UniProtKB/Swiss-Prot annotation:
<feature type="repeat" description="ANK 2">
    <location>
        <begin position="85"/>
        <end position="113"/>
    </location>
</feature>
<keyword id="KW-0597">Phosphoprotein</keyword>
<comment type="function">
    <text>May be a substrate-recognition component of a SCF-like ECS (Elongin-Cullin-SOCS-box protein) E3 ubiquitin-protein ligase complex which mediates the ubiquitination and subsequent proteasomal degradation of target proteins. Inhibits IFN-beta production through the IRF3 signaling pathway by targeting TBK1 via 'Lys-48'-linked ubiquitination, leading to its proteasomal degradation.</text>
</comment>
<comment type="similarity">
    <text>Belongs to the ankyrin SOCS box (ASB) family.</text>
</comment>
<dbReference type="GO" id="GO:0035556">
    <property type="term" value="P:intracellular signal transduction"/>
</dbReference>
<keyword id="KW-0963">Cytoplasm</keyword>
<dbReference type="InterPro" id="IPR002110">
    <property type="entry name" value="Ankyrin_rpt"/>
</dbReference>
<feature type="repeat" description="ANK 4">
    <location>
        <begin position="150"/>
        <end position="179"/>
    </location>
</feature>
<dbReference type="InterPro" id="IPR036036">
    <property type="entry name" value="SOCS_box-like_dom_sf"/>
</dbReference>
<dbReference type="InterPro" id="IPR037332">
    <property type="entry name" value="ASB8_SOCS"/>
</dbReference>
<feature type="repeat" description="ANK 3">
    <location>
        <begin position="117"/>
        <end position="146"/>
    </location>
</feature>
<dbReference type="Pfam" id="PF07525">
    <property type="entry name" value="SOCS_box"/>
</dbReference>
<keyword id="KW-0677">Repeat</keyword>
<feature type="modified residue" description="Phosphoserine">
    <location>
        <position position="17"/>
    </location>
</feature>
<dbReference type="InterPro" id="IPR001496">
    <property type="entry name" value="SOCS_box"/>
</dbReference>
<keyword id="KW-0040">ANK repeat</keyword>
<keyword id="KW-0833">Ubl conjugation pathway</keyword>
Length: 288
């Protein structure tokens, strides 16, 4: 082997070793206790190198280290790069930490990036009920009605967990409450599936009431028969039967129609400018 080839191979090996140490340092795996991120980058660690399924930027978001996220971006980390799971750093940040989300968005992260299952960062923020991340993403142009592989929206993801805070914010931004996924499920039927498992709390009950106000009228029955899992809870079944049997009133149907006509914008601001009495504005905003 020529000396020049040996030198090139040694250089590549050294850089790879530094990059692996960078990942370990960010993740606080102290194989090298005296390592720090800035020194490793200065020494030649590649901020875009993938180790296994991980990239440094994604790893920093996983441990909610906003300072490290900003440092990596300053040093050239690709903000929309995909890791081994076809996820961007923003997918990880959206689940965990608003500060990381804000830094990534400032550096040009795509709020509508899709992972391997067509999930957006907003889907994950809503599912984890990270309300401030939900708000930050929506303010930065995230699609409130983005569809995953099953045609579920972020509202569906929030509803299936009974995440009241996230559901409320999504509805404020005009989320479509009557969306139906490929299995025929709606956000409210997703929430009912949680309630029938006996896992409902006061917050989940409040989430149901909010979704019910937003949708106006809904139907869970098929050919007049409630799903078998619903019938196992007699009290809940009776309540849902009454609600499903009640036709939507002109008032509730008008509320849904007006909210939808206002389009995809922050509805509290849009409603505020309407020439309506305060009581009607509150009604449109699902406050009563």
């Amino acid at each position: 082997m020529s000396s020049s080839m040996w030198y090139i191979m040694q250089s590549i090996q050294s850089k790879y070793s530094l990059s692996e140490r960078l990942i370990r340092t960010i993740a606080a795996i102290r194989s090298f206790p005296h390592d720090n991120v800035e020194d490793l980058i200065r020494g030649g660690a590649d901020v875009n190198c993938t180790h296994g399924t991980l990239k440094p930027l994604h790893c920093a978001c996983m441990v909610s280290d906003a300072d490290c996220v900003e440092l990596l971006l300053e040093k050239g980390a690709e903000v929309n790069a995909l890791d081994g799971y076809n996820r961007t750093a923003l997918h990880y940040a959206a689940e965990r930490d608003e500060a990381c989300v804000e830094v990534l968005l400032e550096y040009g992260a795509n709020p509508n990036a899709l992972d391997g299952n067509r999930d957006t960062p907003l889907h994950w923020a809503a599912f984890k009920n990270n309300a401030e991340c939900v708000r930050a993403l929506l303010e930065s142009g995230a699609s409130v009605n983005a569809l995953d592989y099953n045609n579920d929206t972020p509202l569906s993801w929030a509803a299936m967990k009974g995440n009241l805070e996230s559901v409320s914010i999504l509805l404020d931004y005009g989320a479509e409450v009557r969306v139906i996924n490929l299995k025929g499920q709606t956000p409210i039927s997703r929430l009912v599936a949680l309630l029938v498992r006996g896992l409902g709390t006061e917050k989940e009950d409040s989430c149901f009431e909010l979704l019910h106000r937003a949708v106006g009228q809904f139907e869970l029955r098929k050919n007049g028969i409630m799903p078998r899992e619903v019938t196992k809870d007699q009290q809940l079944c009776e309540k849902l039967t009454v609600l499903c049997s009640a036709p939507g009133t002109l008032k509730t149907l008008a509320r849904y129609a007006v909210r939808r006509s206002l389009g995809l914008q922050y509805l509290p601001d849009a409603v505020k400018g309407l020439p309506l009495p305060v009581s009607l504005k509150d009604y449109l905003l699902l406050l009563e």
